[in-house]
Structure formats: structure tokens, C-alpha cells
């Protein structure tokens, strides 16, 4: 999808850059594949804020997306491509030969009337789902499972992908978007291709209101608070905070490594992630 620069007839439109979604379905989603969704507003079951800066936003219906892709050997035809307000990637509505409808993550380049299929023996084409052991080295994949039959977890956001590096016994080496090279069981499934909506990283919302529509509330800087509210707060006039950046609870941030040392999954990591500058 291309980018759309709006005519600056108002101040809020002056810097707005959006993704042109003219090729997407404009109607309602498939009724049998949506369920109600209640926004938590960043609260847990006790009503305590666990994620700050969340709340409000437009009402949304949850689309039931097939992340397991375990209907093997049955071809499915792409009926349409749709926008999903709950994720950055686009969805593809597919109809299987037996008449069943399903939503899948749309890879880049997938078009209406294209045919996708899952299972052993499938061609290595965008949208097809295979076991990692059946995918040749150098192929870009997305929606990768960490456990067989567990459903895709890795590389599901817009424009994301992982690259198959090679075989290592019962495992496959996979290079993730962070630069980390990880061993994953060859029986785990992945979908061929790069996730759709590559230009999502280039959009500019243009105004605070559009961020509120998405369910994000304002973020207040710590140095603008009082000492009771944040370690960076207080001081006469404007200050720099007087210390390295920390969270409201005093935990170092902005580059501090948060991964627990000695995790059992460390043995599956061949090359640690590289921080992007």
C-alpha cells in the first residue's frame, strides 16, 4: 500500500501522512468471525493501572484470526483484504474448498483470488504455511510458532519478518528482526512472506486526537511532575532531572537490559539481539 499525503487545508492535516487503504474492503467484517471486545483501559482484574497511557479510543470488534493454519491440504481462495483496528497488519478473508471462511494475516503482495494452502508439500509462496524444516534457507517468513501446534507468535506486526538461516539437527536457525539468531524446532510452522502494510512505520498521525482514537492517552514527562510523583520531579524552574533516566518506580530505563539472566531459553539463542541505532 502506498502513502497518502493529505492537502494541508487545516493545521492538523499539514503534517499528516497516512497509508492509502483504497484497495481494502470498505464494508463490515465477516459476522461469523467477530466477537465483542471490551477495552480494559490499561487496568487489570482489580482495577489497578498496569499499563499507563491507555484508555478511550473507538469501539472495536475482535476479529478471530487463524494463527495456527492447521487445515492441511485444503486450498483457500482470498476473497478480500481487510483493515483490522486491533493490529497494524492487514487481514485476508479466505474461503476453503469446503466453504469454511477464515481470517489470516495477509502477507505483502497477496491479492484477491490468490490461492493459499497449508501443510507438507505446499509450495514456498507468500501466504502458504509450512513447517520450518520444509522451508529453504534465506526465505522470509512470518507468524512463526515457538512450539508445534501452538499458533504463530513471532513476526506478526506490519512489515515484520524473520529469515530462515539453516538447519541444526532437529532445529532450524531463525534470524529475528532484532538481529537475534534463535533455534526453533523444525516441526514448528511459519507462513512464507513478509507481513503486509510495510509503510506503517512511515505514517504521521498529524494531531493528538488521532492518537486518542487509537486508545492512547497523553504521556507526561517525569521532569514536569512533582517529587512525590516521579524521581525526576521537582526543582526550581526547568531541570534535567539530575540523574539517569528511570521509570516512576526508580527502575533504570532507556537502554537498560531487562531480560532475566540464566533463563532456560538461553540455550536456544545462538546470537544475541543487536540494538538498532
UniProtKB/Swiss-Prot annotation:
GO biological processes: cytoplasmic translation
**Which stretches of sequence are listed as region Disordered?**
225-277
User: Is the Electron transport keyword given for this protein?
Assistant: no
Concerning SMART domains, the annotation shows: Ribosomal_L2 (SM01383), Ribosomal_L2_C (SM01382)
Superkingdom to which the source organism belongs: Bacteria
GO MF, one annotated term? rRNA binding
Tell me which Gene3D superfamilies the record gives.
Answer: 2.30.30.30, Nucleic acid-binding proteins (2.40.50.140), Ribosomal protein L2, domain 3 (4.10.950.10)
Q: Name one GO cellular component term.
A: large ribosomal subunit
Kindly give the InterPro entries that the UniProt entry links to this protein. NA-bd_OB-fold, Rib_uL2_dom2, Ribosomal_uL2, Ribosomal_uL2_bac/org-type, Ribosomal_uL2_C, Ribosomal_uL2_CS, Ribosomal_uL2_dom3, Ribosomal_uL2_RNA-bd_dom
Q: Where is the composition biased (Basic residues)?
A: 254-264
Task: Identify the keywords attached in UniProt to this record, alphabetized.
Answer: Ribonucleoprotein, Ribosomal protein, RNA-binding, rRNA-binding
Q: Which NCBIfam families match?
A: rplB_bact
* Function of the molecule: One of the primary rRNA binding proteins. Required for association of the 30S and 50S subunits to form the 70S ribosome, for tRNA binding and peptide bond formation. It has been suggested to have peptidyltransferase activity; this is somewhat controversial. Makes several contacts with the 16S rRNA in the 70S ribosome.
Q: Quaternary state and partners of this protein?
A: Part of the 50S ribosomal subunit. Forms a bridge to the 30S subunit in the 70S ribosome.
Q: Which HAMAP family did the record assign?
A: Ribosomal_uL2_B
Family, according to the entry, reads as follows: Belongs to the universal ribosomal protein uL2 family.
The protein's name in its UniProt record: Large ribosomal subunit protein uL2
Instruction: Give the source lineage, highest ranks first.
Output: Bacteria, Pseudomonadati, Pseudomonadota, Alphaproteobacteria, Rickettsiales
Amino acid at each position: 500500500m502506498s502513502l497518502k499525503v493529505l492537502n494541508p487545508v487545516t493545521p492538523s492535516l499539514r503534517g499528516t501522512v497516512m497509508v492509502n487503504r483504497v484497495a481494502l474492503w470498505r464494508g463490515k467484517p465477516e459476522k461469523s468471525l467477530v466477537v465483542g471486545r471490551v477495552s480494559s483501559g490499561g487496568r487489570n482484574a482489580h482495577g489497578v493501572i498496569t499499563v499507563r497511557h491507555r484508555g478511550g479510543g473507538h469501539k472495536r470488534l475482535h476479529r478471530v484470526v487463524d494463527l495456527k493454519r492447521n487445515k492441511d491440504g485444503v486450498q483457500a481462495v482470498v476473497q478480500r483484504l481487510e483493515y483490522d483496528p486491533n493490529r497494524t497488519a492487514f487481514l485476508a478473508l479466505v474461503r476453503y474448498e469446503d466453504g469454511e471462511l477464515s481470517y489470516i494475516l495477509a502477507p505483502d503482495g497477496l491479492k484477491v483470488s490468490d490461492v493459499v494452502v497449508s501443510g507438507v508439500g505446499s509450495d514456498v509462496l507468500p501466504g502458504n504455511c509450512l513447517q520450518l524444516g520444509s522451508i529453504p534457507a534465506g526465505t522470509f517468513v512470518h507468524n512463526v510458532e515457538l512450539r508445534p501446534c501452538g499458533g504463530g507468535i513471532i513476526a506478526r506486526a506490519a512489515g515484520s519478518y524473520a529469515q530462515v538461516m539453516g538447519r541444526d539437527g532437529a532445529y532450524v536457525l531463525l534470524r529475528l528482526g532484532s538481529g537475534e539468531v534463535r533455534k526453533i524446532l523444525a516441526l514448528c510452522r511459519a507462513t512464507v512472506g513478509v507481513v503486509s502494510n510495510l509503510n506503517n512505520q512511515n505514517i504521521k498521525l498529524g494531531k493528538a486526537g488521532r492518537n486518542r482514537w487509537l486508545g492512547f492517552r497523553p504521556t507526561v514527562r517525569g521532569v514536569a511532575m512533582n517529587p512525590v510523583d516521579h524521581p525526576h520531579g521537582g526543582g526550581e524552574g526547568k531541570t534535567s532531572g539530575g540523574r539517569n533516566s528511570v521509570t516512576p518506580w526508580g527502575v533504570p530505563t532507556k537502554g537498560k537490559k531487562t531480560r532475566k539472566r540464566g533463563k532456560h531459553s538461553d540455550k536456544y539463542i545462538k546470537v544475541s539481539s543487536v540494538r538498532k541505532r
